[in-house]
Structures are given as structure tokens and as C-alpha cells.
Amino acid sequence: MVSSATICSLLLLSMLWMDMAMAGSSFLSPEHQKAQQRKESKKPPAKLQPRALEGWLHPEDRGQAEEAEEELEIRFNAPFDVGIKLSGAQYQQHGRALGKFLQDILWEEVKEAPANK
């Protein structure tokens, strides 16, 4: 007959195996998504403001804005966060390609959304 030590060890291993399986499935559970949304709702909305305008809007920061090279910062949230910093010259050079890239990505998401419903 099977010893009690073997039965206890099998029981312990099966419980540990179930814990591992539950940990793997929690990522897809609705509770995880709700917790993630609560975390995101606590964040203040990001300010989208070119740094060149900061000195104009806040005169006390004008010295810092003039010292730093003109930069443009673009951020948006999708299923993931994306942030891009470009200088004025880089934006002039790559602005159209970046705009087309973002339009293509966002347009694909709009096309896929009705198909998923």
C-alpha cells in the first residue's frame, strides 16, 4: 500500500501546482483589469505642451527655456504608453513620417474595433 508520506507529498505538490496555475491565470482575470484601471485613474492627465511655449506661458521660466534647446514632447496612451522627444530640427526633418506612422497605427485600431464587436 502507498505510504502516508507519499500521499502527503503528492497532496502538497498538487496544491503548489494549483497555486502556480492560479497565478498564471490572474493576468487575464477581470479583477486584474479593474485593479489596473483604478491605478491608471489615479494618475493625473499628462500635459501636452511644447517646451518652447513653456517660457511664453510662464515668464518666470523664460531663462530656462531659452537655455535649453527647443524640444517637442509627444505622449499618448493606448494599451501602452508612448513618449517621444524631438528637437525642433528633428521634428522638421521627421515630422511628416512620424505623423503618418501615428495615423496608420491609430487608423488600424479604428478599423479593428468594429470588427471585434
From Swiss-Prot:
Task: Indicate, by first and last residue, each region the UniProt record lists as having compositional bias (Basic and acidic residues).
Answer: 31-43
For the keyword Oxidoreductase, the answer is: no
Q: Which InterPro entries match?
A: Motilin_assoc (IPR006737), Motilin_ghrelin (IPR006738), Preproghrelin (IPR005441)
Q: Name one Pfam family in it.
A: Motilin_ghrelin
Residues of the propeptide: 52-75, 99-117
Q: Post-translation: what modifications?
A: O-octanoylated by GOAT/MBOAT4. O-octanoylation is essential for ghrelin activity. The replacement of Ser-26 by aromatic tryptophan preserves ghrelin activity.
Positions modified as Leucine amide?
98
Q: What biological process terms from GO does the record include?
A: actin polymerization or depolymerization; adult feeding behavior; decidualization; dendrite development; excitatory postsynaptic potential; G protein-coupled receptor signaling pathway; gastric acid secretion; negative regulation of apoptotic process
The entry's family comment says: Belongs to the motilin family.
- From the Swiss-Prot or TrEMBL record, give the protein name: Appetite-regulating hormone
Q: Which gene encodes it?
A: Ghrl
